[in-house]
UniProtKB/Swiss-Prot annotation:
It is an enzyme of class 1 (oxidoreductase). Induction: Induced by drought. Accumulates upon root colonization by Myrmica ants (Myrmica sabuleti and Myrmica scabrinodis) concomitantly with jasmonates induction; this leads to the production of carvacrol, an attractant for the phytophagous-predaceous butterfly Maculinea arion, whose larvae initially feed on Origanum vulgare flowerheads before switching to parasitize Myrmica ant colonies for their main period of growth. Strongly induced by Spodoptera littoralis, a herbivory insect, thus triggering the production of carvacrol, which exhibits insecticide properties. Residues 471-496 are annotated as: Disordered. GO terms for cellular component: membrane. Signal peptide: none annotated. GO terms for biological process: defense response to insect; response to insect; response to water deprivation; terpenoid biosynthetic process. GO terms for molecular function: heme binding; iron ion binding; monooxygenase activity; oxidoreductase activity, acting on paired donors, with incorporation or reduction of molecular oxygen. Belongs to the cytochrome P450 family. This is Cytochrome P450 71D180. Keywords: Heme, Iron, Membrane, Metal-binding, Monooxygenase, Oxidoreductase, Signal-anchor, Transmembrane, Transmembrane helix.
Length: 496
């Protein structure tokens, strides 16, 4: 009995302390915060995130409380931006203020203590690695130089589809293999024996790192950090990742050059590592972190976008017919089409843009407001975690007619690009932290998609109709399909 009373006293004391701390923190906040839903003591608005994917739940909140909404998630104060206007102000007008990232357990473990580029803080290291990326690694010129790799891997994929003619094929799995092979050969100069294991690890990491860990939301609690089960799972994954990447890098050192005779991405990183004039020297972990960036941002996102594009075209047969007609007319007689050839495919570009609007590769873009500022009339305190809901902006009826409908033809009337200039459509982000690999990513989406539309017609398995297709998403940084895309390919006969 005494023990029970003691526990009650302890629990009451702890809760009282947490409530008082919560009120003390609230008293330090400015008065002109963005609108906010009613919150609970201690947990704040955490209970509102139940029952759906984060981008869906946050859209519901901003639809009710305004395009700029303030949330308290545990101890952490966050702001959600769900309009083109507020996002433009944060990512363009106030870009240096919002160019930072906030730390999380997932990024610190899997991305080498954020010693990469995607999750790096806004500092000299980030500026340096981004400059290398833009000028040396993923420039438009280098993207074109990887053309033969795309052609080679597309030929492999086409052979797989041909061998499955008339039978159901797991298109998601085969497209992911192709995307992984392209990135692996561009990074390491050759196909590597464990690249399949790395691809599986990327999927697992993206799924786990996309969640809201309690230890991240209560950073002052050593107990929650100690009890965080996912932290230990991520640490085991990090060990597997180290083994794979260390093996890749050792294998890379013994070969003389990439398969195209020049430098691959790892060659460039090693060369830069030896440069004694660099402000922030590149470490071995920095090289591994950047390689994991390339795989996580370049493999899964490209593959996911192709899968969503094919899914939407299968669900909208009239759009499929139009896309195939254009591809087959413009690419007729071209044996190995690449980036220059697909530039002529206006409708294909619209299909890709519409796919990225509905299924952005990064539904939520994280930023950190490093100093107090004002966005659309509201005060954003310093060190506020900021989430840009790209998924919600792409489905906002204020910018898009029939926003939930897949309609590539809308871009005949509305001229918007996907490279960060038009804030109604920012699948790759915008401002200083716009994705530096967007040209590489677009090439690895448009070229394979064009060839898949050129060479094959498609049916759904058994008695399934377009209306039966499951278009659900599953949790993950890249917004992947919940279920794999299963299709029946038929070789297109131009004379039939």
């Amino acid at each position: 009995m005494d023990i029970s009373i003691s526990w009650v006293v302890i629990i009451v004391f702890v809760l009282s302390y947490l409530i008082l701390m919560d009120k003390w923190r609230a008293s330090k906040l400015p008065g002109n915060l963005p609108p906010s839903p009613p919150k609970l003591p201690v947990i704040g608005h955490l209970h509102l995130l139940r029952g759906g994917l984060p981008q869906h739940v946050l859209r519901g909140i901003t639809q009710k409380y305004g395009a700029v909404a303030h949330l308290q998630l545990g101890e952490v104060h966050s702001v959600v931006l769900s309009s083109a206007e507020s996002t433009k102000q944060a990512m363009k007008v106030l870009d240096p203020t919002f160019a930072d990232r906030f730390d999380s357990i997932g990024s610190q473990i899997m991305w080498y203590n954020n010693d990469d580029m995607i999750f790096s803080r806004y500092n000299d290291h980030w500026r340096q690695i981004r400059k290398i990326c833009v000028s040396e690694l993923l420039s438009p010129r280098n993207v074109r130089s990887f053309g033969f790799i795309r052609q080679d891997e597309m030929a492999r994929l086409i052979r797989v589809f041909e061998s499955s003619e008339g039978a159901a094929i797991n298109a998601s799995e085969e497209i992911s293999k192709m995307s992984c092979a392209i990135v692996c050969r561009a990074a390491f100069g050759s196909v590597l024996k464990d690249q399949g294991k790395l691809a599986d690890l990327v999927k697992e990491a993206l799924s786990m790192a996309s969640g809201f860990e309690l230890a991240d939301l209560y950073p002052s609690s050593w107990l929650l950090n100690l009890l965080c089960v996912n932290k230990y799972r991520l640490q085991r994954m990090r060990g597997r990742l180290d083994n794979i990447l260390d093996g890749f890098l050792e294998e890379h050192k013994v070969k003389k050059s990439g398969e195209f005779g020049g430098e691959d991405i790892v060659d460039v990183l090693y060369r830069m590592q030896k440069d004694t004039e660099m402000k922030a020297p590149i470490t071995n972990n920095g090289i591994k972190g950047f390689i994991f960036d390339v795989f996580s941002a370049g493999t899964e996102t490209s593959a996911t976008t192709i899968q969503w594009a094919l899914s939407e075209l299968m669900k909208n047969p009239e759009k499929m017919v139009k896309a195939q007609a254009e591809v087959r007319e413009k690419l007729k007689g071209k044996t190995n089409p690449d980036v220059a050839d697909v530039q002529e495919l206006k409708y294909l570009h619209s299909v890709v843009k519409e796919t990225l609007r509905l299924h952005p590769p990064f539904p939520l873009i994280p930023r950190l407001c490093k100093e107090e500022c004002e966005v659309t009339g509201y005060t954003i305190p310093a060190k506020t975690r900021t989430l840009v809901n790209v998924w919600s902006i792409g489905r906002d009826p204020a910018y898009w007619k029939d926003p939930d409908t897949f309609n590539p033809d809308r871009f005949d009337e509305v001229s918007r690009d996907v490279i960060g200039n038009d804030f109604e459509l920012i699948p790759f982000g915008a401002g200083r932290r716009v994705c530096p690999g967007l040209h590489f990513g677009l090439a690895n989406v448009e070229v394979p998609l064009a060839q898949l539309l050129y060479h094959f017609d498609y049916k759904l398995p058994s008695a399934m109709t377009a209306a039966d297709m499951d278009m659900s998403e599953t949790p993950g940084l890249s917004g992947p399909r919940k279920n794999p895309l299963i299709m029946i390919p038929t070789i297109h006969n131009p004379t039939s």
